[in-house]
A protein has these predicted regions:
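Charged helix-capping and loop-helix junction motifs
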Residues: 119-122
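Beta-strand/loop substructures that line and gate deep hydrophobic ligand-binding cavities in soluble
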Residues: 125
Length: 128
C-alpha cells in the first residue's frame, strides 16, 4: 500500500484513449496503426468506413476475404492486432462516444494545431 501511495503521488493518471481510423485504404497502414497503438497503450481502436479490419467473431465477410485482409494487416501489425481490442463500425460512432464521456479530438497539422507536448488530455479521449 505504501508503494501505491508513493507512486500515485508521482505518476499522473493515464487517460483512456481510443483511436478512430476512418476510411483508411491500406492494410499496411491499418497494421501500423495497431502496432503503434499497442506501443502507446491505446485502450481500443475503432475501424470504420471502408477501412480493412482483421477477422472478427461472427464476421459476415466471405472467409477468403477476411483471411486475406487479416493476413495483410498482420504483416505490418506483427501480432498487435491480437493485443489491442478493436471494433468495426460502418459509421464513426461519435454520438455514443460523446455519451460515454469521450472528448473527440481531430488530429491534423495546420497553423492552428496545438503541439502534442502542450496538449492536456481529458480522462477519456477519442483521437480521430
Amino acid at each position: 500500500v505504501a508503494i501505491a501511495a508513493v507512486l500515485s503521488g508521482i505518476l499522473s493518471p493515464v487517460p483512456e484513449i481510443i483511436v478512430i481510423a476512418h476510411n483508411i485504404r491500406s492494410t499496411h497502414n491499418v497494421g501500423a496503426i495497431f502496432r503503434t497503438a499497442e506501443g502507446f497503450g491505446i485502450s481500443k481502436i475503432i475501424l470504420s468506413g471502408y477501412t480493412p479490419y482483421p477477422k472478427l467473431s461472427g464476421d459476415t465477410r466471405l472467409p477468403h476475404i477476411s483471411e486475406k485482409l487479416t493476413s495483410q494487416i498482420h504483416k505490418t501489425a506483427l501480432g498487435a492486432e491480437e493485443m489491442v481490442p478493436f471494433a468495426y463500425s460502418e459509421q464513426i460512432p461519435l454520438n455514443s462516444l460523446k455519451e460515454s464521456g469521450y472528448r473527440i479530438v481531430a488530429l491534423e497539422q495546420n497553423d492552428r494545431s496545438i503541439n502534442l507536448a502542450d496538449y492536456t488530455s481529458p480522462e477519456k479521449v477519442a483521437l480521430l
